[in-house]
Design a protein with these regions (language model features):
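Catalytic core of DAGKc-family lipid kinases
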Residues: 78-159
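Gly/Ser/Thr-rich active-site loops/lids in small-molecule metabolic enzymes
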Residues: 155-159, 163-199
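N-terminal glycine-rich "phosphate-gripper" loop used for MgATP/nucleotide binding
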Residues: 50-54, 61-63
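ATP/NTP phosphate-donor binding region
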Residues: 1-47, 88-103, 114-125
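Conserved small/polar residues in nucleotide/adenosyl-binding loops
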Residues: 271-277
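Short glycine-rich anion-binding loops that position phosphate/pyrophosphate groups of nucleotides
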Residues: 54-56, 79, 167-169
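A conserved acidic, glycine/proline-rich C-terminal tail/linker
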Residues: 211-236
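Proline-centered loop/turn at the N-terminus of a beta-strand
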Residues: 16, 68-70
Length: 277
């Protein structure tokens, strides 16, 4: 199992290892006895290793939050933009990291505040990729009145609206026709989901802009999603989205940069297109 391989590699290199409590309880039969677990992190930790895909990194961020602990993503599935280290490259990657041969990519997050208190959102109100509002009912569109810094922009008549970070620009927003934004760019993108008016295009804005959304529609409620977490809000809510006060630090190895991953992704898409011609 690659987890036991990783633990063995780290122990040989005299690294102190702590596994997340829930994960540890599932794997402890496979692990050496002197492995510790954690439920919360503090600033005494040097690095968090996430094993899975980009979704696993989104969960890892909920542990790190504002602590500035660098995160490294090991990919056990398809090629990801965040979890970029392949399973068969674990040993090389660990040695590079221990030797300090890496750079830090700082990623902006966005957070949401609602005019009416919502317990689910107040516990964890930030997202790395995107915050999206969308219709709850599958048959009718919603109108999303959108303001930027309290100035009226537009009322989008659509299935929903995505507010994406540069990191999230390669995800849901991209599949709805949004642009790819370089991770270090200080921007956000507003992308309509299946707009009624085909002239409603994605809009790139400065990331210090405060975005205010008010939803109207036949239903009294709408859905709001923060990355993979989703909850229901009443139409009486005003949703305010802005940049979070903290950033996440992602470890990037020299041969695993954003441009290399982007090129590989684009090449894969092009190859699939050629194969179907």
């Amino acid at each position: 199992h690659y987890i036991t391989k990783l633990v063995s590699l780290l122990k040989k290199r005299k690294v102190s290892i702590f596994l997340e409590e829930e994960y540890y309880s599932q794997l402890k039969e496979l692990l050496p006895e002197n492995i510790n677990s954690f439920t919360k992190l503090d600033k005494s930790y040097d690095l968090l290793i996430s094993i899975g895909g980009d979704g696993t990194i989104l969960k890892a961020i909920t542990f790190v939050k504002h602590l500035s602990i660098p995160i490294v993503g090991i990919n056990s599935g398809r090629l990801g933009f965040l979890a970029k280290i392949k399973i068969d490259k674990i040993e090389e990657a660990i040695d590079e990291i221990i030797s300090g041969n890496y750079s830090i990519s700082e990623r902006s997050l966005i957070e949401v505040v609602t005019s009416e208190k919502n317990n689910e959102l107040s516990k964890l109100n930030f997202a790395l990729n995107e915050i999206a509002v969308s219709r709850k009912n599958t048959t009718s569109m919603i109108s999303i009145e959108t303001k930027l810094d309290d100035k009226y922009l537009n009322s989008y008549w659509a299935d929903g609206l995505i507010i994406a970070t540069p990191t999230g620009s390669t995800g849901y927003s991209l599949s709805c026709g949004g642009p790819i934004i370089m991770p270090e760019a200080e921007n956000l993108v507003i992308t309509p989901i299946a707009p009624h008016n085909l002239n409603a295009r994605p809009l790139i804005i400065a990331d210090n802009t405060e975005i205010s959304l008010k939803v109207n529609g036949r239903e009294n409620e709408f859905l709001i999603s923060l990355d993979s977490r989703i909850t229901t809000l009443s139409n009486t809510n005003v949703v305010v989205i802005k940049k979070s006060p903290f950033k996440i630090k992602m470890i990037e190895l020299e041969n695993e940069s954003f441009l290399i991953t982007l090129r590989e992704k684009l090449t894969v898409s092009y190859t699939h297109l050629r194969a179907h011609e």
